[in-house]
């Protein structure tokens, strides 16, 4: 039964994009809460998701995924500076999660900090060299800074990665 439950939780994490932080803490309630927040946010119920996230952060203040979701929601409702603070908190708690750097970089681009965004995309690529989104966004940051050749190289690499990933999926 325990093995089945763990398998079910891992499937939920894959479906809802949850990292393994809450799993490492062996806390099913935290996983369920993060899943609910993600579902609310993904369906456009931002204020309800934000409220649930704030409540969860009182209970799980060291859970980086909660800061990630809070920041993502804040970014969606145009609270970019607040979002940046929460992306920073997520990264402070887990500096090995490439996704956090990508989304923080996107937030920095929204704030016209293209140099900072490029640095975040560099870190994401260092952590996950097959992240097509990181290459795409770094290309956009380079383009915004006038580095057309660098942007072209990154966008070409992103396309190659997408082609490889599509090939794997279609097999």
Question: What are these model-derived regions, one by one?
Answer:
Residues 2-171:
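Alpha-helical tetratricopeptide repeat
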